[in-house]
Amino acid sequence: MIAWRTDDLSVALAPLKQSFSPRLVAKPNDLAPPPGECSGEALVSFSYAVSRILDGYSVLDPKLVKDQLEYGSYASVKDRFLYIEVYKAASTTMRILLRGLYGSPERKLFPGFNGDTLGSIYARESVPLPPITALEDKDQRELLEAPDVLRFTIVRNPYTRLVSAWRNKVVLCDPWIDDVYAAVRGETPPIGQQFPVEFAEFVSYLESTVGRVWDGHWRRQIDLTFPKSLSFTHIGKVETLQETIRILAGQIKYRSHIQIPNINEVVIRPSPKYSAALAARVYALYEEDFENFGYDAKSWPQDREDRSCPVSERCFLDYVIARNLIITRLNRECARLRQEHDAVYRFSLARVQNKLRAIIRPRHSR
């Protein structure tokens, strides 16, 4: 019988999280580098794209910027475009679309997805386009400055984007992100005794962590796109996604109609229970997103009646949350066993080496 440890979840999942986007595992206060570590000499080792962003956002951690571009940028020198993705803003849709347009390499499976088609799309290698950081500096500069290059991103109404992240990642205790439930309630719930984190509670959690590098699913969109430095020629919106797809098709001279993949449908849609007061708190957290991307401060969603479902919302949520908690604990045990295996393996190698030395030394002494 497995005895579950009570170690901090973030420590237990650290080895597995390394398979995911590095920007999702950022530590608190990583936004600004230590004093003296961002001198002109230090910037020499970074690519043109990273240096360009740091010129416009001097307080950012260079490594965080580099990691973010390596995972969330898609470049084509031949077709003259650069796409910067934003989580919870059609990013999965765009991955599937780009994968279809540029070929389909063998999917790299992520731990825990067990061959799931949608899950494996999140491996960076599943989209056969290089990040801009993988290009030569001259090509990076050309993509960032040439007037004929389509430099685009896709953003979303901050109100609905945050609700989407809450429904998909927080309510269901997603095992692949930091444990918001434990941060809000003080501990991870026992299986069968979970009470989903309400949207207002999630907003309070964000308010208490301002100044940290948030998970990419609810990080401010300006912190994912660096608009001051990347000189976008087109900023698309989830609400008018077909227009962005049309512009991309024209840029790459794709003559056929591009069908937008229909994904991320949810069976249950718990209400965020937006009020004017709650919306004002969300607006304060994402004010720069509203201002930079042209979203109305009064555009928060009104509650809508959930569509019918053969099971109750509470029953459905309990089932999915329990499943995710089990995955989390299995991941924790997997990480522990991996560490023990590595320790035993190293010890076994040392024993073999000692035996070989004992055999070889007498022969040399003859």
Where are these regions (language model features)?
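Helical coiled-coil/dimerization "stalks"
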Residues: 339-366
